[in-house]
Amino acid sequence: MARVKICGLTRGADLRAAIDAGADAVGVISEVPVDSPREVDPATAAELLADVPPFVTATLVTMPDSAERAVELLRTICPDAIQLHGEWTPDEIRFIRAETERKVLLAVDADDPARAEEFDRVADALVIDSTDDSGAGGTGETHDWERAGDLADRLTSPVVLAGGLTADNVAEAVRAADPFAVDVASGVELTDGRKDHNAVARFVANAGREMELA
C-alpha cells in the first residue's frame, strides 16, 4: 500500500483533517519564488508543523536560494523532513543532510529521468512530479505513470509519485507506478489552498486500493 502525503496545508483545520484521514505525512509550503495560494510564511509553517503528532512525518516544502538557507529554515521550522524543488547539486543535498540530520526529498521532473538517476542514493527520496520551468510542482498535471514506475524500478531511493493526482485517479496511479508514496496538493482542494476534507479522506482511502476506486 502506498504511503500518502497531503501537501500545501495552510490551516490547522486542514492539517487535522489530513491526520484524521490517516495521512502518513503532511506538507507545508514556505519560501518558494512562485505565486502559490498554498504558501505560508516560515512562522506559520513552524506553528502548523509543531501540531503534527508522532508517527506522522511533518514536511517542509521549499525552494530556498541556497543550501545554507535550507539549513536555516530547517533549524527555524523544525520539520521531520524537507522537500526541495528547483536546481540543486548532489553536494548541496549532502551538505543539508549532514548539517541537519533531516531527511531530504528532492523533486525531479517526470520527463528528466537522468536527473532522478543522478540523485539516486543522494536524496532520501525522489518526488517524481510534473514541474514548471522553475522546478516548482503544484501544476495539477499528470504524467506517464507507467514510465514513472519503470524509473522507480531502476532507483534505490524511494519514489514519491506526484502531479495531477486526485481521489478519483490515485488508485489507478498506484497500480501503474507502484510508488513508495503518493503526494497531493491541488487535487484535494476547494479553492485558494483550502482543502476539501471529504476529498482528502477519499484520497487516503483510495491510495490503498490499487484496483478499485472508493
Curated annotation (Swiss-Prot):
Main EC class the enzyme belongs to: isomerase
Database matches in HAMAP family: PRAI
Catalytic reaction(s) noted: N-(5-phospho-beta-D-ribosyl)anthranilate = 1-(2-carboxyphenylamino)-1-deoxy-D-ribulose 5-phosphate
InterPro entries from the UniProt entry: Aldolase_TIM, PRAI_dom, RibuloseP-bd_barrel, TrpF_fam
One GO-annotated biological process of the protein: L-tryptophan biosynthetic process
Protein name: N-(5'-phosphoribosyl)anthranilate isomerase
Pfam families: PRAI
Keywords, sorted A to Z: Amino-acid biosynthesis, Aromatic amino acid biosynthesis, Isomerase, Tryptophan biosynthesis
One Gene Ontology molecular-function label: phosphoribosylanthranilate isomerase activity
Pathway assignment: Amino-acid biosynthesis; L-tryptophan biosynthesis; L-tryptophan from chorismate: step 3/5
EC number: 5.3.1.24
Annotated family: Belongs to the TrpF family.
